[in-house]
Every structure is written in C-alpha cells, then in structure tokens.
Amino acid sequence: MPERKEKGQVSVGAAEDRGKKGHSEKKDKRKQEENQEELHQLEEMRERLIRRIGIHGADEKVLKAMLRVPRHLFVPEYAKKGAYIDTPLEIGFGQTISAPHMVAIMCDLLELSEGLKVLEIGAGSGYNAAVMGELVGKSGHVYTVERIEPLVDFARENLKKAGYENVTVLLDDGSMGYSKCAPYDRIVVTCAAPDIPEPLLEQLKPGGIMIIPVGDYIQELVRIKKDPEGKIHEEKRGGVVFVPLIGKYGF
C-alpha cells in the first residue's frame, strides 16, 4: 500500500532535486562573480600598460584606441595572463602578436584617422587590426591578409567576439598585397621583408604612408611616403625584430 503524505510533506527525491538546484545556482553565481573579478583585473592591467606606453610619448589618440581594445581576447587561452605585459606573445604556427609598444609606434607612424582605408599584411590574431579599426572608425576599413588558414579563422573569431565590423580578414599571399580593394591610404606590414615588395608600392595611394620592417637578421623599420606625383620617399625609424614575410615577394 503506497505511503500517504501528510499535507505540506515533501518527498525525499524532491528535496534532493531542490538541494541540487540550489547548489548549482550558488556555483553559477560564484563562477559569475569570479569572471567579473577577472575581467576587472584585466581592465586594470590594460590601463596600467597603456599608461606605461604613454610615458614614452605615444600619441594620445593611439593610446585611447588601445585602451578600448581588449588584448586578452586576441591571445590563446594559455597566454591570457600575459596579455597586458608589454611583450610579444606566441599565437602558434611560429607566429607572434606584436608587443603593445610596437603597435603604438606603428600606429603613430601611420598617422591613422577617421575614414581611411588600410591594408595590413600579417593578420596574426587580429589585435593590431582591431586597434587600427578603432582609429579609422566606422567610416574607414581595415583589410588584413594572412597566409596561415588557422590564424585567419582565429583572427576572424577574435574580431567578431570583440565586435569589430570594419575589419576584413583575408586568406592570401600578403607579400602581393590585395589588389581587389586597392589603392590604400595606408599599408602596414607586420613581418620583415627582404626588400619592399613592388605590389605594395603600387597599391599605395599617392599621399599614402606605408610602414614595413625590412631585413633578415638585422631589420629596420621603414616609413614610406608616396607624394602626390607618385614619388617614393623612405625614412628609417630604427631597429626592430619581426617574423619573416613569407610569399612571392618575401623570404
């Protein structure tokens, strides 16, 4: 004969279910609080990093753009804790994400502003493109070319997660530029070339600026300006260390 329940009595099974639910809710709440705390810590670390870079004279506009870009969303999970250290970080396939101070230097030299069309060679994780996306705004656009397919997917995922709709990641040989959307107001190369690739010079608008590391073991950052008549002017801006540009006009 089934056991009769008194009014208000709860079965053992129901009590256990309620207990499990309560425990799960507490666990979820604790996890949410931990995530919020981690996010707060990362934001504080980002602010400290940008302040340190600013001490060395980086442009205020560039610093503000970098402050808006969550670098921790552009590194592999294992490198997240080092996202706001001013150093390059490995992102796999023998590639790195540039040190933040170098991102600031290159963006300064590019003289980026609202509405410009930019070509980047070497998308990597998408971080540099995101910073440039902030600087050119919604009326501008950044096209970034990457030869390693898994990194193309990684960069696209990161940029989507961070909310950048004015950046397009392309799978191609970056040493040849991207003629379909040429000419460009600005071109930046985030890997070292043996010489300045002719297709990139051709795809740079008159009045445009290109930044490119040139060299093998000894590399120099070169700033190129194309005057309104199409004449090229080069200026060396100091020694750097970048991964090599691979492709038809690379190593």
Curated annotation (Swiss-Prot):
Entry's EC annotation: 2.1.1.77
GO CC terms of this entry: cytoplasm
Transferase listed as a keyword: yes
GO biological process: methylation; protein modification process; protein repair
Localization in the cell: Cytoplasm
GO molecular function terms listed in the Swiss-Prot or TrEMBL record: protein-L-isoaspartate (D-aspartate) O-methyltransferase activity
Comp. bias intervals (Basic and acidic residues): 25-39
Catalytic activity reported: [protein]-L-isoaspartate + S-adenosyl-L-methionine = [protein]-L-isoaspartate alpha-methyl ester + S-adenosyl-L-homocysteine
Subcellular location, principal: cytoplasm
Keywords on record: Cytoplasm, Methyltransferase, S-adenosyl-L-methionine, Transferase
Enzyme active site: 98
Residue ranges of the region described as Disordered: 1-39
Coiled coil residues, start to end: none
Keyword Calcium: no
UniProt similarity note: Belongs to the methyltransferase superfamily. L-isoaspartyl/D-aspartyl protein methyltransferase family.
Function (record text): Catalyzes the methyl esterification of L-isoaspartyl residues in peptides and proteins that result from spontaneous decomposition of normal L-aspartyl and L-asparaginyl residues. It plays a role in the repair and/or degradation of damaged proteins.
NCBIfam families, alphabetized: pimt (TIGR00080), PRK00312.1 (NF001453), PRK13942.1 (NF010549)
UniProt-recorded name of the protein: Protein-L-isoaspartate O-methyltransferase 1
Organism of origin: Methanosarcina acetivorans (strain ATCC 35395 / DSM 2834 / JCM 12185 / C2A)
Gene giving rise to this polypeptide: pcm1
